[in-house]
Each structure stands twice: as structure tokens, then as C-alpha cells.
Amino acid sequence: MTAAEAPLPPLAPRERTATTAAERRTGSPLAVSLSGVRKSFGDKTVLSGIDLEITRGEFVVLLGPSGTGKTTLLRLLSGLEPPDGGDVLVPRQRTVVYQEPRLIPSKRVLANVSVGQKRAQLTRDNARRALAEVNLADKERAWPATLSGGEAQRVALARALVREPELLLLDEPFAALDALTRLQMQDLVGDLVARHRPAVLLVTHDVDEAVRLADRVLILDNGGFAVDVDIDLPRPRDRNDPEALRYRATFLAQLGVGRPSSTRQDIS
């Protein structure tokens, strides 16, 4: 098993004795809790005491300028990067889908989906169901080299789903896809998340993607969250809806697009 397919290391859960604000807001159990989390690399502070709660079934999108710590936060939640301080609560069942599908070239599609899983026959059955969910039931005998970029990324999604994660981490999974395939993948991910109900954290630079998919958008800047706002729009979402355009314009302004960074605005 390669490092890309190895199970994520467990983090010891922390006891909780009270219902959190996030649980009261969404009505779902808490999946992620960060309290006062800090992370630095040398003299550069990336995360300076952040707090974050995500509940089961909540789709959170993380935006931010390059170098602000988005991928560091995702790696911290996956267990691949230790915090320098603070408390971390994440579920043991969690998985990551990256920008590159990271399929094993020497294994067929079905074997890629079931890699690392035990109980071979049950795993194959589950892998076939996962492939059907991503509309690749006819590709189980295919080799990775024969797949398009979108198909390979769907295999990576199926591999994540077969593990039944309570937390799904998405690290710019659509960034390398063409515009049409990107929209199709966004719709597919939205449908799969609605069906399986994991907590989701999607890291992206695409504001339109955030407005299209998110229940909640965070913008990371200067070591903390400059924005933490719910997206209160019906689904499916029309990118030309006036409210969607308002969210888009506000997020772009906060990211410093189209105006000097000194005039970034807060939203409530």
C-alpha cells in the first residue's frame, strides 16, 4: 500500500459534555472541533489560535489567498500535520480526495477503489456500488491510464465513499478539470454528500464553486477566519440569482479581487 492509500492516522477524541453552537444551529452531531489551534513553520505563523466546528452533513468551503494555510488546515484535519497547540477533535473515519486522483497504475479501477480494505468479497461489492454511484459501473475492469481526467477523479471519489467517511476532505479536486467536467463533478459531489451526509471541508480558490456547493464559507487570512458565513440559498443554485451574485461579489472583495486589500469588507 502506498502512502496515498494508507489509512489516515487516528487522533484521540476529546470528551464533550455540552451541546455546541454548531450542533444547535444545524441540528446534526458534531464531526469536527478545533479550539485554539496554532501552527507555524519557522518564523511564519500560519494558524494563530483558530476555532472551528463542523457538523455531520455540513458542506464547508474554505477560501483564501495562496499561502494563507488552507492546505495546512486540511492536512491538520487529516492527521498528516500535527498542530503546535490547541485541541483537535476529528472522527476516525475520514478520507481525503486530492487534486490529483493518485490512482495506482498497476491496479484496475475496481481494485483501486477497494485498495486497503479488508474482507475481500464485501469490499468488492461495496466498491461496485460506489462505482455505480459515480456513474462508472462499466469501468471496473479498466486501467487508470485509459481514463479521462474526470473519470479518474470520479474513481478517487468512489474510493473515498467506499470507506463511509464521517469527514470528507477535498483538496481542490476539480482544479485540473475542464470547465464542463468541473461543473459536472460539482453536481456529482453535491449529490453524493447529500446522500451520504459526511461533514465536508472543500479547499478551493474558486468563489463560484464555493457559492454553488457550500452550506457555509470560510475565508482564511492572517492566521484566522476573516469570514465565516452561511450560504442561505435554495438548491440547485442559479449562479445568476441576485443573492448568489451578492455572495460572490462580497467574497471576491474580501479576497482583494477588484479593489485594494485595505478596503476588504466584513459580512455578517
From Swiss-Prot:
It is a peripheral membrane protein. ATP binds at residues 64-71. It is an enzyme of class 7 (translocase). Keywords: ATP-binding, Cell membrane, Membrane, Nucleotide-binding, Translocase, Transport. It is found in: Cell membrane. The keyword ATP-binding applies. SMART domains: AAA (SM00382). Its EC number is 7.6.2.14. GO terms for molecular function: ATP binding; ATP hydrolysis activity. Residues 13-26 have a biased composition (Basic and acidic residues). SUPFAM superfamilies: P-loop containing nucleoside triphosphate hydrolases. Pfam families: ABC_tran. Residues 1-27 are annotated as: Disordered. It catalyses: ATP + H2O + aliphatic sulfonate-[sulfonate-binding protein]Side 1 = ADP + phosphate + aliphatic sulfonateSide 2 + [sulfonate-binding protein]Side 1. Residues 32-247 form the ABC transporter domain. GO terms for cellular component: plasma membrane. The complex is composed of two ATP-binding proteins (SsuB), two transmembrane proteins (SsuC) and a solute-binding protein (SsuA). Belongs to the ABC transporter superfamily. Aliphatic sulfonates importer (TC 3.A.1.17.2) family. Part of the ABC transporter complex SsuABC involved in aliphatic sulfonates import. Responsible for energy coupling to the transport system. PANTHER family: ALIPHATIC SULFONATES IMPORT ATP-BINDING PROTEIN SSUB, TAURINE IMPORT ATP-BINDING PROTEIN-RELATED. This is Aliphatic sulfonates import ATP-binding protein SsuB 3. It comes from Rhodococcus jostii (strain RHA1). The lineage of its organism: Bacteria, Bacillati, Actinomycetota, Actinomycetes, Mycobacteriales.
